[in-house]
Structures are given as C-alpha cells and as structure tokens.
Amino acid sequence: MIIEKEKMEEIMSLVIEEANIAIKEGNSPFAAFLLDKEGNILYRAHNTSNTNTDPTAHAEINLIRMACKELKTKDLSNYILISNAWSCSMCFSAAIKAKINRFIFGAESESNMNPNVTIFDIKDKCKNEINVISGILRDECKIQIEEARS
C-alpha cells in the first residue's frame, strides 16, 4: 500500500515532536518511527547517545532493537522506517540488515558526518531493492536540526 503524502507529512510532524524530546534530554535532534504498510505508527524512538553514554544509541538503532525484541523477529521487511533526517551509514546499514526496505526521510544528512557516506551510496551497493522517499517536511526538519546544533 502507498502512503499518501499528506499522511507522511502528518507522521513526520510527530517525528519532529519526538526529536524535540531528544533535544530536551541533551541528545542529538533525531527521531525515527516504525510504521506498518498502512502508515500506522507501531514504534517510536529518538537519539539517546548522550543520556545513555552510548555512541550507537541513534534513533534508528534504538527503534530496530525495540521492534525486533517486541516482535520477536530480526525480519522487519513488512515495515517502513520514517526519520526526520537521512540515516547515518551505521543506522541505514542496520536497517537493511533488519530487512527494512522502505524508508521515508525529512532532511538530508549533515555534511560533517563521519564517515560521510550517504544513504544513496549504501543503497546503490545493496543486493535487494531499497525504496526511499526523501524531502517530507524537509525545511521543518532541517531548521530543527540546525537550531539544535547552534
């Protein structure tokens, strides 16, 4: 099933709210949700790297760990990941390892990522088909990230 743009924007506004929780807790301004194919929100997570003193506690990693544990599976191929920014190489690779193949993103990745490997660099090397929709509430997501970083 295809999720309408209006529904994606509605969900992205909730992702932005979740990212605000990360910011208030002193973490990086990122959040991610796991959706079913109809666009229903099943799981929510935000970055907790600083509060957990864990450099791998990005929103997507937290989300994947939570969903796999609760669903008792490592196969998330029936779900969609939505995030306020392009995933870093670690998170995008982890999502692909969890067999997620549908992604919805807001803003592009930050240019200072290390390593600076984009989702499209990784997507181009995947053996399976990966579907990416980007730019949903892009400006709102970008402003949130820039303001949190300043």
Each model region followed by its residue ranges:
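Short loop/turn motifs at secondary-structure junctions
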Residues: 28, 75-77, 99
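A short, polar/charged loop-to-alpha-helix boundary motif
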Residues: 51-61
